[in-house]
């Protein structure tokens, strides 16, 4: 599953993801096409090998831990307004 040849940013994405995991995230998150945070347990285990899963191989929209925390804070507000 070494996809660094396909996406030149894959190694950089994996390095950033490792930093975010060390800063407190429990999982790697990407922004999906609908603009929502999407966790990826497969990427979470692969980033320590410098890789991402096949599904996220071309998704450079890695979410930082700050962005994930901000989205988590907004979720109860969005759910209570429905």
Swiss-Prot record:
- Keyword Amino-acid biosynthesis listed: no
GO BP of this protein: symbiont-mediated suppression of host gene expression; symbiont-mediated suppression of host innate immune response
Q: Which UniProt keywords apply?
A: Eukaryotic host gene expression shutoff by virus, Host gene expression shutoff by virus, Host-virus interaction, Inhibition of host innate immune response by virus, Interferon antiviral system evasion, Viral immunoevasion
Q: Which InterPro entries match?
A: Acc_prot_5b_avian_CoV
Keyword Oxidoreductase assigned? no
* Role this protein plays: Involved in host translation shutoff without degradating host RNA. By suppressing host gene expression, facilitates the evasion from host type I interferon immune response.
Protein name as it appears in the record: Host translation inhibitor 5b
């Amino acid at each position: 599953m070494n996809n660094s040849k396909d996406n030149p940013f894959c190694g950089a994405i994996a390095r950033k993801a490792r930093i975010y995991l060390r800063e407190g995230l429990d999982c790697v998150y990407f922004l999906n096409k609908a603009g929502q945070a999407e966790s990826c347990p497969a990427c979470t285990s692969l980033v320590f090998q410098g890789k991402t899963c096949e599904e996220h191989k071309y998704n450079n929209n890695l979410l930082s831990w700050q962005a994930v925390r901000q989205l988590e804070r907004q979720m109860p507000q969005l759910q209570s307004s429905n």
